[in-house]
Each structure stands twice: as structure tokens, then as C-alpha cells.
């Protein structure tokens, strides 16, 4: 992270003996080439790495996904207000997941993020399955849809 102030997270692994893979993450849509260069220059210095190691710096892979939930609200709840609140909660969820490399998108966590006091039930429509994100990937939410499908007395 000290190589460039834009770096928010980093993954370091050794995919093969004698090789070090460094994957820096920034808040930018694409990791700028200057960040890759800065990390390479800092980590490839002979006083930093063993002489036999090869340093590879790579941009992270973006794993796009969309969030869609169907919610049933308790009677008396205002659909527009609650839709906005749930959308905001899902935006926070997506932002938190985007901030680190390798954070999985788990359907039960999506449902939990929607559990406001006015929500009776949540069905996660998308993603259709849990998304397992590798340490060299970051999850990137491309859209959020909240459908109010009904009301219940509880």
C-alpha cells in the first residue's frame, strides 16, 4: 500500500515457486497503469525481494454482478420509502464488498442487508447463487433492483 496512495487493498501470493504475484486494488474502475508500475518498482528493488524471486504485478480481475431482491413488507409500510431504504442498504453492502479483494457475495448476507424493521420477507433473485471471489478479484455491483411484491400482517 505504501507504493501508491491510491491502493486500498493488496493481495500477495506465490502461484509458483520463485514467483511473487502482487495484485493492488484501487477505488478506480480500472487499476491505473501508474499504480502497477509503482508497485513493481517498489517491490522489485533488490533490497526488498530475494534475488531468486520474480515479481509480477497485475491488476485485479473485476467480477461483475447485479443485485435483485423481492421483498414483502409489513402492512402499513410505505413501499416507495422502504424501497429507497433497502436500496440504500444494498448500496452500502456492495460498497463494502468492493473495498477489498476476495470478498464473496453470499445470498444470505444480501437478505440480511435487507432486513429492516418494515420487511416481512426477502427473496434474493440475483445473483442466482453465491459468488466466490478469488484473492485476485473484486466484486463489482452493476445494478440494484428492489421489487416490493406484497404486504403481510405478519
Task: Please place each PLM-identified region on the residue numbering.
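An aromatic-glycine-centered, glycine-rich loop/turn in mixed alpha/beta architecture
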Residues: 84-154
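Carbohydrate-recognition loop of C-type lectin domains
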Residues: 1-103
Amino acid at each position: 500500500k505504501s507504493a501508491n496512495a491510491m491502493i486500498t487493498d493488496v493481495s500477495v501470493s506465490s502461484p509458483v515457486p520463485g514467483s511473487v504475484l502482487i495484485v493492488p486494488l484501487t477505488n478506480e474502475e480500472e487499476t491505473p497503469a501508474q499504480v502497477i508500475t509503482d508497485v513493481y518498482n517498489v517491490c522489485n528493488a533488490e533490497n526488498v525481494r530475494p534475488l531468486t524471486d520474480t515479481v509480477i504485478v497485475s491488476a485485479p480481475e473485476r467480477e461483475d454482478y447485479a443485485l435483485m431482491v423481492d421483498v414483502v413488507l409489513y402492512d402499513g409500510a410505505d413501499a416507495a420509502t422502504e424501497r429507497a431504504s433497502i436500496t440504500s442498504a444494498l448500496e452500502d453492502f456492495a460498497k463494502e464488498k468492493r473495498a477489498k479483494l476476495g470478498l464473496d457475495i453470499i445470498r444470505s448476507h444480501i437478505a440480511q442487508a435487507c432486513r429492516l424493521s418494515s420487511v416481512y420477507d426477502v427473496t434474493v433473485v440475483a445473483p442466482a447463487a453465491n459468488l466466490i471471489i478469488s484473492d485476485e478479484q473484486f466484486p463489482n455491483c452493476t445494478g440494484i433492483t428492489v421489487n416490493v411484491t406484497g404486504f403481510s400482517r405478519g
